[in-house]
Amino acid sequence: MTEPTWTRERLQRLVLREVGDYRIIVVSNRQPYIHELVEGQLQYAFPSGGLTTAIDPLMQECGGTWVAYGGGKGDRYAVDEKNRIMVPPDDPAYTLRLVWLTEQEEQGYYYGFSNAALWPLSHNAFIEPVFEQTDWETYQSVNQEFARQVIDEIDGRPAAVFIQDYHLALLPRMLREADPDVIIGQFWHIPWPNYEIFRICPWQDELLNGLLGNDMLGFHIGDHCDNFMEAASRILGSRVHQEYSLVYHRSEPTLVRPFPISVDFDQIDADARSSEVTDEMGRLTDEMDLGGKLVGLGIDRIDYTKGIPHRIRAIGRFLEFHPEYIGRMVFIQAGVMSRININAYQQLAEQIETLLEEVNGRFGTDNWQPIIYIPTDLPNVTLMALRRLARFCVVSSLHDGMNLVAKEYVASRFDEDGVLILSPFTGAAHELTEALIVNPYAVEQFAEAIYHAAVMPAEERRDRMAAMRAVVQENNIYKWAARSLVDMMQVGRRARRPIRSF
């Protein structure tokens, strides 16, 4: 394969050129390094995920500050009197500043407004949002606390603040009012709903006003940008300049652009080739009795947006239509439970268990069952081995901003084998057009897509996978970080002209 356009080293060179004298401050709910107490000893973990993969090297190069909620049990023991600690632990390069929340604040801000209101509001999964006044008030106060800490960190110096996601929608306006000269950008990692859905939110004006405090606001795809700009126009009366993707609110422009997030292709590709993964493939094949069988895979956080019940039904229909695969195929559904104190997630877990019992009970035998369910947090080497073993991987999201599972599967298949079955309701479907695109609500079509993956000739599998790998390699996580940084810095310096693209 060809060399990728963007690498970690090129991103670091870009940082030096673009940032100049500005202090870079990243703000997110989730922290890049978590400190835990293990048998009285302080240990740290580096959470996996696209956000930390992209921004950690950027921060290591520019030496700024990352402000985040401190949720680790050892975090308070690791920081100094100003709640700061230098990271990474083995080669300190930038400052991590932690924000403390009470249990009540975490409940109202995170589990309440962020994930019981904004999350279902933003995803077309037909889960009714829960809008509680007390949750909204807590969300405001927590955003204000983040603003206070960021302003303290800026301390009157030139600064550029890069905010992450839906937990901090009010923060940009708070920062803009506190320091009009600061450069502010934000990336919204989930979909933005259409106008008719968004306007059910009782605090629609406040959310839009908060986000329009940004110089730059990024989404995964153009449709979400369009939805946001329509909401700003129709709800706030903001002026929208479609050609240049600018929204003018209070005569202040905000650039609204798509920046499709991705993965570290080269790192995943290298990990997939390791002897540890090869050994793990052998262990899993023996342990799960996968030898000679058609293996399918789903890797998801257990969330109602991921369409897990829909794929279980489709597997049942596949076996009904094609009984010759009974005893000859295994579908492995891996994923970790999340947000279990929210009713919708508890109901989802019960629904999944019921459907698994139905399908496995109907088609299973004494020594075989079609679906193996692993609702635990698996180590990376095991996940990588599962990707390598799977003839097909299913991403059946009902609505997803991007979905990196699809790109991780593609990046891991250096053998250029495997079939990706992908929902059209993901951002990834806009890029990975050689996947088998199937509507998860259409159970018969879904079942036939599984059959198509099962019988697809090796040459077609290779052609499709090679094309998708080229897309993911070129549009990797470092390209996302580079485009986001350049556009934020350029528009933040009041360069009111079309921003160049890479």
Predicted regions and their residues:
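Catalytic cores of carbohydrate-active enzymes across secretory and cytosolic contexts
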Residues: 1-502
